[in-house]
Amino acid sequence: MVDPLCNYNVLESIFSYLELNDLNRCSQVCKSWYHFLNDENSDVWRWHCLRKLPKEAVKSDLLSSVTTYKTKLRAYLHAWSPNDCSRNVYVKPNGFTLHRNPVAQSTDAARGKIGFRHGRHAWEVIWEGPLGTVAVIGISTKEAALQCHGYVALLGSDDQSWGWNLVENHLLHNGDTQGSYPLLNNAPKYQVGERIRVILDCDDNTLSFEKNYEFLGVAFRGLPDKKLYPTVSAVYGNTEVSMVYLGTPLDG
């Protein structure tokens, strides 16, 4: 009779050296392998997490909302793309935070590595430096511009992007202000360091936001059937913005 512990150790050793796409296929082979890989804090996920994530990120307070090795790894794979941002922006070594260089008369944006066309998705955005005159968070397609001259609300300036300007509490799309947001009397302004949760529902074609665990309402409806990416645009020199992908949002 084979010792179950022996089987466990063998699987652990094999799965630790597979690529992530292969792990997904393995989880569909049988119930035993599914349950094995369903443990998000197992040594397999720990191994993959520590191998891919920068050391400074794994135990950072930035990832306090993603508590397992698997969800930390997933957040990293969805973080800002160093290849899909303005030339005046770079992604810091932690992999989750972008830094805007102090370039005069420029507005600069960045997109996440992975876009969404189906399902429901949530991520947190944390503005960790001054907002400046314009600071916009939201979504865009691949066609939306990532840099322009002047200090403007770049995200939301065309029909390929949708944004919330945190400075003025305005919604922006197609170059127009779509109204105030949230719809509250004397709505409080964003404070640097607050976590804003962005909720994209590709099934219902809506974009919503939460702040301090309070749902602020639906911001945009009728989103197109296109792949949409987490996006921000900034104007302030040396400001920094972090993004942490959370997965499917919890209702209630």
Swiss-Prot record:
Ranges where the B30.2/SPRY domain occurs: 58-250
Keywords annotated in UniProt: Neurogenesis, Synapse, Ubl conjugation pathway
GO annotations of cellular component type: cell cortex; neuromuscular junction; nucleus; pole plasm; SCF ubiquitin ligase complex
Major site of localization recorded for this protein: other
Disulfide bonds: none
InterPro entries tied to this protein: B30.2/SPRY, B30.2/SPRY_sf, ConA-like_dom_sf, F-box-like_dom_sf, F-box_dom, FBXO45-Fsn/SPSB_families, SPRY_dom, SPRY_FBXO45
Annotated PANTHER family: F-BOX_SPRY DOMAIN-CONTAINING PROTEIN 1 (PTHR12245:SF7), SPRY DOMAIN CONTAINING SOCS BOX PROTEIN (PTHR12245)
Family recorded in the similarity comment: Belongs to the FBXO45/Fsn family.
Subunit organization: Component of an E3 ubiquitin ligase complex composed of hiw and Fsn.
Entry function: Required in the presynaptic motoneuron to down-regulate the levels of wnd and restrain synaptic terminal growth at the neuromuscular junction (NMJ).
Protein name: F-box/SPRY domain-containing protein 1
Gene source species: Drosophila grimshawi (Hawaiian fruit fly)
